[in-house]
């Protein structure tokens, strides 16, 4: 098992980042790949969780140990796999998540992709009271120069599809942001807030 990796961030895609260390490039699935944009070709530390399957060894990465802790709690719930947990972490509203779990807000929990009523109820059953305090929001929120356009929106939509959101939902998101100019990371954060509002 791995705790973290320290190396050079060499690539960003809609689903994952690549960190090179000792001549090897590690594919790491992350909640919002574009939150790492400022770190391309720089030394980064990514906290890791490894999932071993018959057909693949997968790495899931996080900005902070708090973000990783939320992910680990989520995958301990029956019905929540790593991809779904990553989509929940991507919303970057841990306070809202913890409040929903502690207050049995099933409707809020069902707004996450691939979370039905049964799984939402299981989340409450398994995780209520398990978060001593809501961790700080975990994404990289550094302001950046505004160099976005439709390409940035396209990348954001692609990343949201990878998180499990439906194309029909994302058509509305695209229409909402058409004509605006943001980074892919900012589009993703704003879109996730809109999707959670329903």
Swiss-Prot record:
Highest taxon of source: Bacteria
Region (Domain III): 148-198
Annotated segments matching region Flexible linker: 143-147
SUPFAM superfamilies registered for this protein in UniProt: DNA helicase RuvA subunit, C-terminal domain, Nucleic acid-binding proteins, RuvA domain 2-like
GO cellular component: cytoplasm; Holliday junction helicase complex; Holliday junction resolvase complex
One term of GO molecular function: ATP binding
Keywords in alphabetical order: Cytoplasm, DNA damage, DNA recombination, DNA repair, DNA-binding
Region (Domain I): 1-63
Region (Domain II): 64-142
Bridged cysteine pairs (disulfide): none
Keyword Flavoprotein included in the entry's annotation: no
Subcellular location: Cytoplasm
Stored CDD domains: UBA_RuvA_C
Pfam family, one: HHH_5
Biological process annotations from GO: DNA recombination; DNA repair
Known function: The RuvA-RuvB-RuvC complex processes Holliday junction (HJ) DNA during genetic recombination and DNA repair, while the RuvA-RuvB complex plays an important role in the rescue of blocked DNA replication forks via replication fork reversal (RFR). RuvA specifically binds to HJ cruciform DNA, conferring on it an open structure. The RuvB hexamer acts as an ATP-dependent pump, pulling dsDNA into and through the RuvAB complex. HJ branch migration allows RuvC to scan DNA until it finds its consensus sequence, where it cleaves and resolves the cruciform DNA.
Known partners and oligomeric status: Homotetramer. Forms an RuvA(8)-RuvB(12)-Holliday junction (HJ) complex. HJ DNA is sandwiched between 2 RuvA tetramers; dsDNA enters through RuvA and exits via RuvB. An RuvB hexamer assembles on each DNA strand where it exits the tetramer. Each RuvB hexamer is contacted by two RuvA subunits (via domain III) on 2 adjacent RuvB subunits; this complex drives branch migration. In the full resolvosome a probable DNA-RuvA(4)-RuvB(12)-RuvC(2) complex forms which resolves the HJ.
Family classification: Belongs to the RuvA family.
NCBIfam families according to UniProt: ruvA
Recorded domain comment: Has three domains with a flexible linker between the domains II and III and assumes an 'L' shape. Domain III is highly mobile and contacts RuvB.
Protein's name according to its UniProt entry: Holliday junction branch migration complex subunit RuvA
Source organism phylogeny: Bacteria, Bacillati, Bacillota, Bacilli, Lactobacillales
């Amino acid at each position: 098992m791995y705790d973290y990796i320290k190396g050079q961030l060499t690539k960003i895609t809609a689903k994952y980042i690549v960190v090179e260390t000792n001549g090897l490039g590690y594919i790491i699935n992350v909640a919002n790949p574009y939150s790492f944009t400022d770190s391309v070709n720089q030394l980064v530390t990514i906290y890791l969780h490894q999932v071993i399957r018959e057909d693949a060894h997968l790495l899931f990465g996080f900005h902070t140990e708090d973000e990783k802790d939320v992910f680990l709690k989520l995958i301990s719930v029956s019905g929540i796999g790593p991809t779904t947990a990553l989509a929940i972490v991507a919303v970057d509203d841990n306070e809202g998540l913890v409040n929903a779990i502690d207050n049995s807000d099933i409707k809020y929990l069902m707004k996450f992709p691939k979370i039905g009523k049964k799984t939402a109820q299981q989340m409450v059953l398994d995780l209520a009271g398990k978060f001593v305090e809501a961790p700080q929001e975990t994404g990289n929120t550094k302001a950046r120069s505004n160099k976005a356009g439709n390409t940035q929106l396209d990348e954001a939509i692609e990343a949201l599809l990878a998180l499990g959101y439906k194309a029909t939902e994302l058509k509305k998101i695209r229409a909402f942001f058409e004509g605006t100019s943001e980074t892919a990371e900012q589009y993703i954060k704003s879109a996730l807030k809109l999707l959670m509002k329903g």
